[in-house]
From Swiss-Prot:
Cofactor: Zn(2+)
Binding site for Zn(2+): H30, C34, C37
Keywords: Membrane, Metal-binding, Transmembrane, Transmembrane helix, Zinc
Record-given protein name: Anti-sigma-W factor RsiW
Posttranslational mods: Is processed by three successive proteolytic events. First, the extracellular region of RsiW is cleaved by PrsW (Site-1 cleavage) in response to cell envelope stresses. Next, it undergoes cleavage at an intramembrane site (Site-2 cleavage) mediated by RasP. This cleavage uncovers a cryptic proteolytic tag with conserved alanine residues in the transmembrane segment, that is recognized mainly by the ClpXP protease, which completely degrades the protein in the cytoplasm and leads to the induction of the sigma-W-controlled genes.
Length: 213
């Protein structure tokens, strides 16, 4: 049995929590000298972290039942599990596109044309004119999201600003400490959340980059 086959089997057992103490020690010693197996371990960990992080995203009601009804009857096998470990990045991308696109499209469609604001602090909202005003002297702690309005910042936002179908006016430079993103189409909306979600996934996977963790 080759190095790749033997130690990838050990990696699979380690990820599933089925490896013995002797096998874990053998694997750790091998990973110190084998870059290929170490990279494979990192890829599998990233897939696990990705799926765990995406567990809060829900598909539309009845989605699972409709899919199961159309599936052909077949004996249960471990082919998907093997394929997932062989192509972890492809599986991660497929899961992300399916769940996130469905959820984000639903969120985008439900926004309507009303002016809405997400954030903490004293913000003035005028539904008729569509103006959202951060008054002079007011400091918004955290991120601010404005939908279908015109954001006028006379105070300060200590965080990021997301404008969805909105425009902005800054009374003074530096009034926003974070980034300002404008989203005016559904593809921009999906791309914004894609970047935000993948950033979280990378942060989680970086924390788990050691086999002994």
């Amino acid at each position: 049995m080759s190095c790749e086959q033997h130690y990838r089997t050990l990696i699979d057992k380690y990820i599933d929590g089925e490896a013995t103490a002797e096998e874990r020690q053998e694997l750790n010693e091998h990973l110190e000298t084998c870059d290929a197996c170490f990279e494979y371990m990192l890829e599998v960990r990233k897939v696990v972290a990705f799926v765990q992080s995406a567990s809060h995203v829900q598909a539309p009601e009845g989605f699972t039942e409709n899919v199961m009804k159309n599936l052909p009857k077949r004996k249960q096998t471990n082919r998907f599990k093997v394929w997932m470990r062989r192509y972890p990045l492809a599986v991660a991308a497929a899961v992300f596109v399916l769940l996130m696109s469905t959820s984000l499209f639903s969120m985008w469609s439900s926004d309507g044309e009303h002016v809405t604001v997400t954030g903490t602090g004293n913000v003035s909202i005028d539904q008729e004119s569509g103006r959202v005003i951060v008054p002079e002297g007011e400091v918004i702690q955290g991120d601010l999201v404005v939908r279908n309005g015109e954001l006028i910042i006379e105070g300060e936002v200590q965080g990021n600003v997301l404008l969805v179908n909105s425009s902005q006016y800054l009374a003074s430079p530096g009034s926003v400490s974070g980034e300002i993103d404008e989203v005016n189409q559904i593809l921009d909306w999906i791309w914004y959340h894609t970047k935000k979600f993948l950033t979280k996934v990378i942060d989680i996977s970086d924390e788990k980059n050691s086999p002994s963790s």
